[in-house]
């Protein structure tokens, strides 16, 4: 009952987000914008997004191996895509991360606490990097921020340096088991976020948006990514779109194109999650065949 309530709340939030979006931008303008999209740009966008997932799985593998979970990369990659599928469709506590933890705990000597810690630290590292890139992009559009706060570019840079120093010190003190891979996974996180940003830029190119505006779209894209990382909806659906459309006025960009690019990115991530579902079905079928042959 509790899981059903959470599921219904997420659906309600998605509906609210889209309601607010369509109050700001008409469906006709979105439809017209999508019709103008060059479909060829979906190919590099899809490839770049999947490359980011391959590297994300490799980053997480380093965290697991730090606590003695020696799983082959290919199996971990399959597990990563399966968890994307479960995270997309299963409500409540049965999330993608929970699936990874349960799966590995049954096949290793690591405790639930250790595996949960590794998974959460992996996410925190990625989120910290995401916020850092968003801040660096924001420096390019300080004119927008300075309308509300008299901020300087060097203030943001200093805050980033201090923030990363604090992050590294706390991480090394509180989670010494992962000290050996801390800098490596951080480097992975920067590459992963850049790959996802490039994937989004491919979608912008498909809408023939001039490169001079990509930074503005990118800032809102990262803002939406931060919001969609929260367990508020299904795969961030509606949340990222709401952020881009709401912020489009501040950034002086086309709200219909902002929504459409964000929606296509969400669609790509959803398709990748479905790939995880196919992998899961194939593994279940193979498992049944092995069981039948052994009888």
Where are these predicted regions, by residue range?
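Predominantly cytoplasmic-facing regulatory/coupling regions of multi-pass membrane proteins
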Residues: 1-81, 130, 136-232, 239, ...
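Hydrophobic transmembrane-helix microenvironments that flank and shape a buried ionizable site
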Residues: 7, 94, 119-123, 193, ...
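Juxtamembrane helix-boundary/capping and inter-helix hinge elements in multi-pass membrane proteins
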Residues: 67-72, 104-115, 249-256
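Hydrophobic alpha-helical transmembrane segments of multi-pass membrane transport proteins
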Residues: 73-107, 114, 228-233
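Hydrophobic alpha-helical segments and helix pairs
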Residues: 103-143
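A cross-family signal for key residues in well-ordered alpha-helices
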Residues: 102-105, 201, 245-246
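Helix-loop junctions and terminal segments of transmembrane helices
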Residues: 61-64, 97-102, 241-242
